[in-house]
């Protein structure tokens, strides 16, 4: 049975006032509409428009989080601006990112890149996580610039480059100037890049990373971590010789 737009008026009115502890059954018609929207462009556009409107309204945080979750399932480029407006909101940024990570529209990745340069602290770390989840190679230069010193952001940036992997990320990590936990994160990320390069058939590139890291820890490392890195390099070097 087709869902008529007018039948969504009451459920969306309930959503506009929905808060923690509210009756979730009143939102069931929206849940059903989201499911029915798959394969139905007209219904998708209608539901998406209404969900995006909730994000720009004075609705409670619970209602906006619900809207973000539903947009993560059916959202298109049309609702990217509404989600982008929440990326600097300390209470809703994580839910906006949750949705945008799942968008196929390139506009979603673009707004995450833009937000990376405008937010700080935990919100910046969140953007790094989302860009890594999307394996966004275009963000490598901006992320690489954050891999400096010894801070939580530097650690997160190194981890993001390790997840994005590829030769550009590997080169950025090799040039990183860090210390403490960030330096350890860089080593781990370089190992992740090398593993990804092996899987991509770029064994010579991977081998150069393993050799550099192995040389850095020496033939007889005295710490548990140093020994673990050397062992990982030895396994990696063996993998570059297979096939």
Predicted regions and their residues:
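General marker for long, soluble alpha-helical cores
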Residues: 46-47
């Amino acid at each position: 049975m087709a869902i008529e737009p007018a039948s969504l008026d009451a459920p969306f009115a309930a959503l506009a006032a929905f808060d923690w502890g509210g009756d979730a059954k009143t939102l069931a018609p929206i849940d059903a509409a989201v499911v029915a929207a798959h394969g139905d462009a007209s219904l998708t556009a209608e539901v998406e428009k209404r969900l995006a409107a909730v994000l720009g309204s004075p609705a409670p945080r619970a209602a906006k989080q619900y809207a973000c979750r539903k947009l993560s399932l059916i959202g298109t480029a049309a609702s990217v601006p509404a989600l982008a407006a929440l990326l600097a909101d300390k209470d809703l940024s994580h839910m906006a990112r949750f949705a945008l990570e799942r968008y196929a529209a390139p506009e979603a990745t673009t707004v995450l890149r833009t937000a990376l340069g405008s937010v700080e602290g935990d919100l910046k770390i969140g953007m790094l996580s989302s860009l890594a989840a999307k394996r966004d190679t275009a963000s490598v230069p901006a992320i690489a610039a954050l891999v400096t010193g010894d801070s939580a952001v530097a650690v997160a940036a190194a981890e993001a480059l390790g997840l994005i992997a590829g030769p550009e990320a590997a080169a950025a990590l090799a040039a990183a100037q860090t210390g403490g936990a960030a330096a350890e994160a860089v080593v781990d990320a370089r190992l992740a890049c090398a593993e990804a390069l092996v899987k991509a058939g770029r064994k010579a590139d991977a081998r150069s990373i393993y050799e550099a890291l192995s040389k850095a820890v020496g033939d007889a490392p005295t710490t548990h971590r140093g020994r673990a890195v050397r062992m990982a390099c030895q396994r990696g070097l063996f993998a570059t010789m297979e096939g």
